[in-house]
């Protein structure tokens, strides 16, 4: 019995009901029941500019209210209307501003209901597993009142379980590029041509050189009519790096350019040596950070994660940890414990720097200074979210000072050193008031970590390390890994390297003002003066003068030093004079004498009209350089690439030759696109750092044979339907689908699927065909049995007899013996017939017999 379709026209000739009418009838409350909160929210137009004014359907609006949103954030208010209108956008806003909801809410509003025959309709790509898992949970919460199916495709999980999810025809896929490329190579039936909505979350990280090959394979399988969205907290203004994303007339939304980090975030930079970081970290965790506050610690390598994990456990602290090569189940367990506040410390690498949203996070500690300014923004963006305050502690060594200057050029924030101990002893109240005003104005103050504290904590750490064999075994791998990290990180800018040499000496950081008293400050000032002490005599002179008193050789050394000091002072005076203004040299000279000095010709002077002056360097040069996708390679490679001028050849052969590059390992020329790099083995690098070949391994076929299921996402069927219609509001006439609204035509999957209901003629024809096939098979089996019987009898014939008839004899030689009854052995005997059973002869004969 066929199921009634409410969207079909009635037999009375009435007009078909549209999908919007069905939705209104479905959600209309029964009489006598008051409306629930949020019911009919898509109709009313609130003046407050909330989600009610965006035209969301009831299911989506209820999900938004259930999540706790009341008023959209600036990025949501700016981007969501453009997305709902169908525009491609590239959006940038600082971390914690609600970018995830800005693309999830329009996606759920567009899809609304599950459609098993439409295939995959939305694809969200994330650079890391943690970010993809977080996006999945967020999408499930927003789509709680819809029946949309969402699938998570990330590395670390079993392929078979992901095959099960794909076989259920999900509407939305949230994936990492490496695992999705693996599925595309493994499953031939997996089709992405039906995708209408594509989101690149953290787009600048996705389009970096590490993942560009995977994205190229994915984008090649997408439809050209898709809607493409780029979201990131650090997105450059020039979209040339995202040319392969296929943006069509994109709308650029960039908010909070002057506030790249939260204004509620406090920054603290401590200068110290590399070997002092352990003591400084333990002191911060124990003394400065409350036990009720959650802290995330960023380190450079996974070896440092393991080392700090064991050290903290030896000290009585239980941390959670996460890094790229860690098992996915273990990562989920550690992150879940940290979210549930069972542990208060999380030690991670930069795999958790992007997009990881942990509620109620209070502090961030940067063990190693990030080499890229935007990486620092992503790290510290984990705290001070949604109106909460937080603190970011950063350790800075002497090699990291140039990166510190680059960071503040990117943030457009002034940087000043903390006052020295001598300045504090002279005017402590005035210096403290000056520092407080600088911090209130948004300036960054960096200073030293107290040496007395480091000395006290370092002794205890050394005892713990010497008593633990695991820590001793991890010391050398940590050192080697850190050296490799220093070699591979990008170089800072040349200007910052030059400016570091002119920076003044910093004092104690203001955060430790309440720790040290005036006596300790005096001791620190004395120790700092000892560091700058330079004796006037060499050790030989001092010992000689103490032993023998004044003599001729000591007098010669003193006279030599006096002469040299005079020359040195003259050089210093000359350098100081060169830096003074030239006008001071002729200040007291008459006009006539001035002409002799300066000349009669007027000198060329510099003049700049600020209103009409056009600089050769853009004002936001440091900002865009830090936001650039190619910034991962450092400033040197960017400048070299910008200085190269490639002229396109005027012949086809020359154009093709320009796109090829000789590969040393493959021993041939390979074809490259713009921005692509040569890979030695053709392997792809996943988000965990593992390398694998995107080739078919046969695991999908094994899963098919085991479960007798397959993945079919609309690869075989597809058609066109009218523009503006959805699959839920369409009706079917014959083998075509028609919609209720719109005159244009657009591609809708499975629109031309033939009906499976057969008429009596088709049933009769199929039965006749089946009967004919059965009769043909019976006839064939009868003929085969006769032929087999004939062959069996023919094996027993040994040859013709005298009268020409075949005589049956199981001995192929006629009369002799045969050791192999099947006729393949050697036969001996007398009589007529040879070893094959057909010839004539007398005497003994040898030969191979055949059947």
Curated annotation (Swiss-Prot):
Residues 24-42, 773-787, 796-825 have a biased composition (Basic and acidic residues). The lineage of its organism: Eukaryota, Viridiplantae, Streptophyta, Embryophyta, Tracheophyta. Residues 7-20 have a biased composition (Low complexity). It is an enzyme of class 3 (hydrolase). Residues 733-746, 841-851 have a biased composition (Basic residues). This is DEAD-box ATP-dependent RNA helicase 29. ATP binds at residues 93-100. It catalyses: ATP + H2O = ADP + phosphate + H(+). It comes from Oryza sativa subsp. indica.
């Amino acid at each position: 019995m066929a199921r009634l379709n409410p969207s079909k026209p009635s037999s009375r000739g009435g007009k078909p009901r549209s999908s919007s009418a069905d939705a209104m009838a479905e959600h209309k409350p029964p009489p006598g029941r008051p409306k629930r909160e949020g019911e009919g929210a898509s109709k009313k137009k609130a003046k407050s500019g909330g989600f009610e004014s965006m035209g969301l359907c009831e299911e989506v609006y209820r999900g938004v209210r259930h999540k706790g949103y009341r008023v959209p954030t600036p990025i949501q208010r700016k981007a969501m209307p453009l997305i709902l209108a169908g525009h491609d956008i590239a959006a940038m806003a600082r971390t914690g501003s609600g970018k995830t909801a800005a693309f999830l809410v329009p996606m759920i509003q567009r899809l609304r209901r599950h459609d098993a025959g439409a295939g995959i309709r939305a694809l969200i790509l994330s650079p890391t597993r943690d970010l993809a898992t977080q996006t999945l949970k967020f999408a499930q919460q927003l789509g709680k009142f819809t029946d949309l199916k969402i699938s998570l495709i990330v590395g670390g999980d079993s392929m078979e379980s992901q095959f099960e999810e794909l076989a259920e025809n999900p509407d939305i896929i949230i994936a990492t590029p490496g695992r999705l490329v693996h599925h595309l190579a493994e499953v031939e039936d997996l089709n992405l041509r039906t995708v209408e909505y594509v989101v690149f979350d953290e787009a600048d990280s996705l389009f970096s050189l590490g993942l560009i090959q995977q994205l190229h394979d994915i984008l090649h399988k997408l439809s050209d009519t898709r809607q493409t969205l780029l979201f990131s907290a650090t997105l450059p203004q020039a979209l040339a790096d995202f040319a392969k994303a296929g943006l069509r007339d994109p709308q650029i939304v960039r908010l909070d350019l002057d506030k790249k980090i939260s204004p509620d975030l406090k920054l603290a930079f401590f200068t110290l040596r590399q070997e002092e970081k352990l003591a400084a970290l333990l002191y911060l965790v124990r003394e400065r950070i409350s036990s009720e506050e959650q802290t995330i610690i960023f380190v450079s390598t996974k070896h440092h994660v393991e080392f700090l994990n064991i050290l903290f456990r030896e000290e009585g602290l239980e941390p959670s940890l996460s890094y790229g090569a860690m098992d996915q189940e273990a990562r989920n367990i550690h992150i879940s414990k940290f979210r549930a506040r069972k542990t208060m410390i999380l030690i991670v690498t930069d795999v958790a720097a992007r997009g990881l949203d942990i509620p109620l996070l209070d502090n961030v500690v940067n063990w190693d200074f990030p080499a890229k300014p935007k990486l620092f923004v992503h790290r510290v963006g984990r705290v001070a979210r949604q109106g909460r305050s937080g603190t970011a502690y950063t350790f800075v060594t002497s090699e990291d000072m140039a990166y510190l200057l680059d960071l503040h050029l990117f943030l457009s924030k002034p940087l000043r050193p903390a006052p020295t101990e001598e300045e504090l002893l002279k005017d402590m109240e005035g210096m403290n008031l000056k520092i407080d005003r600088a911090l209130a104005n948004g300036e960054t103050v960096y200073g030293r970590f107290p040496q007395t504290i480091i000395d006290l904590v370092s002794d205890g750490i050394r005892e713990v390390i010497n008593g633990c064999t695991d820590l001793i075994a991890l010391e050398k791998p940590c050192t080697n890994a850190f050296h490799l990290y220093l070699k591979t990180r990008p170089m800072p800018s040349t200007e910052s390297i030059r400016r570091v040499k002119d920076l003044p000496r910093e004092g104690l950081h203001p955060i430790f003002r309440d720790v040290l008293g005036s006596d300790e400050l005096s001791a620190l000032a004395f120790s700092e003066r000892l560091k700058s002490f330079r004796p006037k005599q060499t050790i030989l002179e001092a010992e000689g003068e103490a032993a023998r008193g004044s003599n001729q050789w000591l007098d010669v050394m003193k006279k030599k030093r006096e002469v040299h000091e005079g020359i040195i002072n003259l050089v210093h005076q000359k350098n100081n004079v060169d830096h003074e203004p030239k006008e001071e040299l002729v200040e007291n000279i008459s006009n006539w004498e001035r002409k002799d000095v300066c000349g009669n010709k007027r000198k060329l002077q510099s003049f700049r009209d600020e209103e009409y002056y056009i600089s050769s360097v853009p004002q936001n040069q440091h900002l865009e350089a830090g936001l650039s996708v190619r910034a991962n390679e450092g400033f040197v490679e960017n400048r070299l690439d910008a200085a190269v001028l490639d002229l396109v050849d005027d012949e086809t052969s020359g154009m093709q030759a320009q796109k090829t590059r000789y590969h040393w390992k493959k021993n041939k020329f390979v074809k490259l696109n713009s921005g692509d790099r040569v890979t030695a083995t053709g392997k792809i690098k996943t988000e965990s750092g593992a390398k694998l070949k995107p080739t078919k391994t046969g695991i999908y076929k094994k899963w098919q044979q085991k479960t007798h299921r397959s993945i079919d996402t609309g690869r075989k069927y597809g058609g066109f339907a009218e523009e503006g219609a959805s699959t839920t509001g369409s009706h079917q006439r014959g083998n075509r689908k028609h919609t209720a609204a719109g005159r244009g035509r657009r591609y809708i999957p499975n629109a031309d699927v033939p009906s499976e209901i057969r008429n009596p003629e088709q049933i009769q024809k199929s039965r006749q065909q089946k009967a004919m096939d059965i009769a043909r098979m019976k006839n064939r089996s009868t003929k085969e049995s006769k032929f087999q019987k004939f062959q069996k009898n023919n094996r027993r014939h040994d040859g013709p007899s005298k009268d020409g008839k075949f005589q049956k004899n199981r001995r192929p030689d006629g009369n002799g013996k045969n050791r192999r009854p099947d006729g393949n052995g050697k036969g001996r005997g007398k009589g007529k017939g040879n070893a094959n059973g057909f010839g004539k002869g007398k005497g003994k004969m040898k030969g191979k017999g055949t059947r």
